[in-house]
Each structure stands twice: as C-alpha cells, then as structure tokens.
Amino acid sequence: MVDDSTRKTLSNIPLLQIRAGPREKDVWVQRLKEEYHALIMYVKNNKQSGSDWFRLESNKEGTKWFGKCWYMHNLLKYEFDVEFDIPVTYPTTAPEIALPELDGKTAKMYRGGKICLTDHFKPLWARNVPKFGIAHAMALGLAPWLAVEVPDLIEKGIITYKEK
C-alpha cells in the first residue's frame, strides 16, 4: 500500500508519543515540542535530499499554522500559501490543510481551499493516533496531493506560472 519512497520518508520523521490537543494546555506544550522536533527533522531531511518544498510557522499557542509550499513542474516553481488550524480534538482529528488561492479550482478540494484527504490519508491518520503529527500530515497529505493536482491544474491551464 505504501511505496518504498514514502516508507523511507516516514522512517525519517520521528513518531510522536504525547496524546494532547490544544484543550490540554499543560500537556499541549509538550506535544508542540514533539511537533516542532518532527518538523525540523523532516525539513532537514528534505533539504539533504534536495526535495525542500515548504516552510511553516505557527502562532504562539501552536493552534494556527501558516506558510508557503511549492511544487516544481518543468523546472518552474509554483508557490502557494498554506494554512491550517489544529482541531480541538487533535490528535484524534487530523488538521485540514488549506491552499486558499486554489479554492474552487479542483474537485479534490473543499470550500475555503481545504484539500481533500478523506480517502487515503484520514484512515491512515486514524490508525496512527497519536504517533502522527503535522510533519506526517505534510508528508502523507499535502505532498501527494500537490504531486497529483498541481501538474493536472497546470496542464488544464487553470494555474499558470507567475514570475517572481
């Protein structure tokens, strides 16, 4: 079900242990430390392998996340804003990652630019609570979505390259 490349990526992202969401204020701080550690390791591994593709930051409480993600297609870099909130029932409920500027441009998206992850990612997340975190959502949710949807949107002329 999971290919070798995905398995290798996953093996380089630390699994999380603390089961806490934003409502559990004291324990949430510990969970956030685990989240940041996993994200730092994932980004570091991406840079080392030449596949750096996103930047994220959060508000002080760690409940709102935002940043940029990008996808390379035919040697052109397509960049998108990315954002998501941590659900109050996290980590039982996965974050809903949104790319607001692509809202309404593909059927594999919900209102507000939230990408569709129900068929493949959410069952995997549910089997791995509380071990999966934000880095896993990026690796197993957003990355494959970008790899499938962005080239299709480019080929259809729905999104075009913007000079920087």
Curated annotation (Swiss-Prot):
Chain ranges passing through the membrane: none
GO BP field: protein K69-linked ufmylation
Keyword Transferase belongs to the record: no
InterPro entries for the chain: UBQ-conjugating_enzyme/RWD (IPR016135), Ufc1 (IPR014806)
Molecular function GO labels: UFM1 conjugating enzyme activity
Keywords: Ubl conjugation pathway
GO cellular component: cytoplasm
Keyword Lyase: no
CDD domains associated with the record: UBCc_UFC1
Pfam families: UFC1
Family: Belongs to the ubiquitin-conjugating enzyme family. UFC1 subfamily.
Function: E2-like enzyme which forms an intermediate with UFM1 via a thioester linkage.
Protein name: Ubiquitin-fold modifier-conjugating enzyme 1
Native source organism of the sequence: Drosophila persimilis
